[in-house]
Amino acid sequence: MTDSDEDALKVDQGPSQDIPKPWVIPAPKGFLQHIFGTSQVFQSICDVKPKVTGLTVPLKVREYYSRGQQCLEQADWETAVLFFSRALHLDPQLVDFYALRAEAYLQLCDFSSAAQNLRRAYSLQQDNCKHLERLTFVLYLQGQCLFEQCAFLDALNVFSHAAELQPEKACFRYRCMACLLALEQHPACLSLITEELKQDTTNADVYILRARLYNFLQKPHLCYRDLHGALLLNPKHPQARMLLQKMVAQAQQARQDAGILAVQGRLQHALQRINCAIENNPLDPSFFLFRGTMYRRLQEFDGAVEDFLKVLDMVTEDQEDIMRQAQRQLLLTYNDFAVHCYRQGAYQEGVLLLNKALRDEQQEKGLYINRGDCFFQLGNLAFAEADYQQALALSPQDEGANTRMGLLQEKMGFCEQKHRQFQKAEDHFSTAIRHNPQKAQYYLYRAKSRQLLQNIFGARQDVATVLLLNPKQPKLSLLMTNLFPGMSVEEVLSTQIAHLARLQLERMVEGSLQAGGPQGIVGMLKQWELERQKALALQHSWKQGEPLIETSEKLQATPEIPQVEPGSSEGQAEAPKEEEEKEEEEQKEEEEQKKEEKKEEKKPKLTPSKVASLSESYLDQTSLASSMSFRTTCTSETETSAICQEYRSTSATAMTFSDSSLLKTQSSDSGNNREALSHGPRKIKDIQGQRQSLSKTQATQSQRQNFSKTKAAAHRRNSSKTKATQGQGRRSSKTEATQGQRQSSSEIETSQGPRQEPSKTKTTRSPRQRPRKVKAARGRSWRPSKLDATQGRRRGLLRSSTKTEAFYDSNWSLSKTEDVQGQGQRTSKAEAAQGKSRGMSSTSSKAESTWGPSPSVSKTEVGQDLTYYEVL
């Protein structure tokens, strides 16, 4: 205060020296005494006191200062403010008085006045940091009071002013953040926090503050990032752990919601929820796996692939299940993406995607099938075939793979047909049939190829199969016309070729079903049902096959009836009257044969007068053309009658063939003989209506084979029909119809033994018989001779014509039976019937009765014999 007083004195001395005193009239001496008299009261006034110059203002300031200090010490804040204000009024440049008055205002909680005084003091002395610090402190107190009074905007202004005065202090910015949060100005607060983190990155609290703000703003991925940063700075931060647990719980809830929405089919909403879960907890790979699956189902393949690859990067060794699922889903994504490209026509891109999938998985058949489809569309048929084969190797019974392989083989077959490679085309169509045996068009295409390859039998068989599968197949009528001219669908289906085609088709279908095996409970039920149906069908066939079984059993019971000698037990069992009647019949037959021979000598060699049925002729042509060297022809009714008569005398001789010539086909002789033995003429068309089932045919075949083998062991020949029918003599000549392997005449002669001599007629029955090229026809009606009917009635050993026809009809399915036995021989329903001629005399009849050989007859004799029966 001394310096200030001296300054005040100097200020006072200046004007006293400069300003001149005014001139006044001096008062006369004794004037006051004259006025006041002798009173001493006013005498002092007149005394002139000495004037103190330069000490008036500083003394007052000093006085106010001392009094103000006393008031501060006495907590008399208002009086202190008064004295400091008077002092500042006397001297406004006194900085310390502003600071003292600010303290008094601060104690009075007048923060604004205090801040104003401090601001004045700081403005007068800017180099004094104490005033600035005191000012910011006052502002902080003021802002905090306002904040507590919920005056957030005023508090924000105060804190902002303090932060401007001291930007190095973060506490003022933190208070500003709090004010902004209270004011719900989140973007401004977020920007302020971001600026703060740019300046200071070591404060975990700031990260947590921003993480909470992000979580409030539903930005969990940013929240998790800041939370992760806070945990890196302070792993044991309690607030950070609490927030982390909260986010994990939110993520699990979002995952559950996404699963429910996905089950409901609301994939877009499920995707939103799983995104929220990933944002709350981006370190869980299962969330990315689920989202990748959603992307795949929504056909957002890029996002799906990215998520699955991220899962493979995130999983650890103890998460093998998630890794396998991610790999599986990645393969499915590649596959679905390839399918999408396939639908869009981008086949090459589909191949590339499937190559990626197959690089990691080689045991998935669907990948090979889809890549094969892409190759098929690109025209790379070889690659497509390789992929389909690989798929079938993994799953042989896959319906899709078999269907695609069939289509591929069909296309490859067409390509080979264009290049006129018909054999290769047939192979391709056969492969297609093997993979899809119930596709009718494959058989139709193969039939065309076989027709061009001159495989008529195979072509007809394929056409029959097409009729079985789909009679309304387009372009079938043309092949029907070429291969079965003049025949209807019913007639074709009644042929032996149709039976063979049906059998092969059933075998292929059953084989494919058995190879697949039952798949689960449904497959087992289907298999049981199929077995039950088979059992019912077999039982039904047994019921229908009673006549056939009865006939075959009787044949087995008397296998050597044609070869019975007069001294055998069976011959002795016959009545003596029957033997006498047989001798009389033999004599009559000899007389009739002599007459017939004379007539035949007068006539030239006969030509066929009646054409066989179309079905039999086609079948015989196809089967015989491949295994025999001669062609059969049809015979007239007269010729067949003559053959019947001759067959009765030579049926036993025909049974001397060896086992190598199995019973395969029927000759016209057996049919004629049976018709001759019946009580009345019956047509073969009626016999066709009594066609037996497959099981009956097989049973009859086996019985006939045993019968023929038994007779072949005997090596005996019967010379007459009467001899052949001694004992029980029923339909023994029927088995002769099975000589159908297109054997040459030399082979037949060899099997007959040394009793036959080679001749121009190629005798196969007896030396007196000459084979005729006659084609057996089922549709023609044969008329037996009166003599045959008479002989049949006389003997009384013959069955009814119905049983004979039933047994005869069963022999017509021999070629089909042979296919069942696996012999693989192409046989026809009826082989070439060997024409027979007899010029029987009394000596020849005696020789025949004693089983002796007889010389061969000439063509003239045969002609006479046939002429005789034609006249009858």
Swiss-Prot record:
Biased composition (Acidic residues): 577-590
A UniProt-annotated Pfam family: TPR_1
Region called Disordered, residue ranges: 1-20, 557-640, 653-872
Keywords: Repeat, TPR repeat
InterPro entries hit by this protein: TPR-like_helical_dom_sf, TPR_rpt
Compositional bias per record (Basic and acidic residues), positions renumbered to this chain: 591-604
TPR repeat boundaries on the chain: 61-94, 96-128, 136-169, 251-284, 285-318, 331-364, 365-398, 406-439
Basic residues composition-biased segments: 762-783
Signal peptide positions (record): none
Polar residues bias spans: 610-640, 653-675, 689-709, 721-754, 799-827, 839-861
UniProt-recorded name of the protein: Tetratricopeptide repeat protein 16
Source organism: Macaca fascicularis (Crab-eating macaque)
Lineage: Eukaryota, Metazoa, Chordata, Craniata, Vertebrata
Gene name, Swiss-Prot/TrEMBL: TTC16
